[in-house]
Amino acid sequence: MVKALLSLTRPANLVTAIADVLAGIAIAGYFIPHNPAPAPVGWLALATVCLYGGGVVFNDVFDAELDAVERPERPIPSGMVSIRLATSLGAILLLIGIGASFMVNQTAGGLAISIAISSLVYDRFGKHHNWLGPVNMGLCRGLNLLLGVSILPDQVGSWAWIGIVPIVYIAAITMISRGEVHGGSVTTLRAAGLLYALVIGCVAALAQRQQQLGTAFPFLLLFGYFIFPPLWRAVKEPTGRNIGLAVRAGVLSLIVMNAAWVAAFAYFPLALLVFCLLPLSRLLAKVFAVT
């Protein structure tokens, strides 16, 4: 039962959400004094884990009937977890996430509410739309990055536009994932590859603007190394398995992208620490489903 409940929250993905928040905190400049108070960082880490976990639990709740046909091994259709229990778990996680955010400040709390609403809209409606769905999912990640920025509320307005970058990246992954069950479109996969390249270019440009391109470059190189080969294999053979591997690589590589953000806006040792979340996420991905 415990493993089934954990599986609903996609533990490997939760680690990537923490990396989002750490990247946002770095963008806000919170780490620059080298003596930041740890409590707000801890509250935001708890908040993002609960918000992400609650969102994906509700994804399975709303998909219960479809999963009974396409993924009968999932916790709800297999009978390991009831819809009622899953709904309660999702609601509790979202409420904890919102509450933890308000422990930091009202701006963080407001963003947490926005994340919860955006994730529920995606789970219930957005994912059924070809273009709205990817943008909606990306919005959740963009807001999550800004949740980190909100550790210094006065920085949110200045950096709100930077949330567009994860929106584009997650939109690309969501486009790819549409073919995970029955196989995908080569045209869609190639378009996603162009969006990947655009994201790398944007992060590199911002790193250069911060005069930190040299620090961020190793992480950008690794980022490309992790995301492009699986995508290229899916382009050559767009089967459900190859597309699933491309999606998994894209999701887990969010940690590498976030390490690049930290390298661009903070300093290399902290970026390396964020990068070290990747082995943990990959280990969890061997035990729990990523998608």
Feature-to-residue mapping (PLM):
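C-terminal membrane-associated helical module and adjoining short loops/tails
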Residues: 2-6, 14-15, 142-145, 150-291
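Multi-pass membrane catalytic core of lipid/isoprenoid biosynthesis enzymes
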Residues: 42-48, 64-119, 138-140, 144-148, ...
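Short helix-capping/hinge motifs at transmembrane helix termini and TM-loop junctions
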Residues: 28-32, 104-105, 126-127, 151-152, ...
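Catalytic beta-strand/loop module used to bind and position nucleotide/cofactor moieties
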Residues: 120-123, 131-134, 138, 142, ...
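Short, amphipathic, aromatic/basic-enriched membrane-interface segments that mark the entry/exit
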Residues: 7-12, 60, 76-86, 103-108, ...
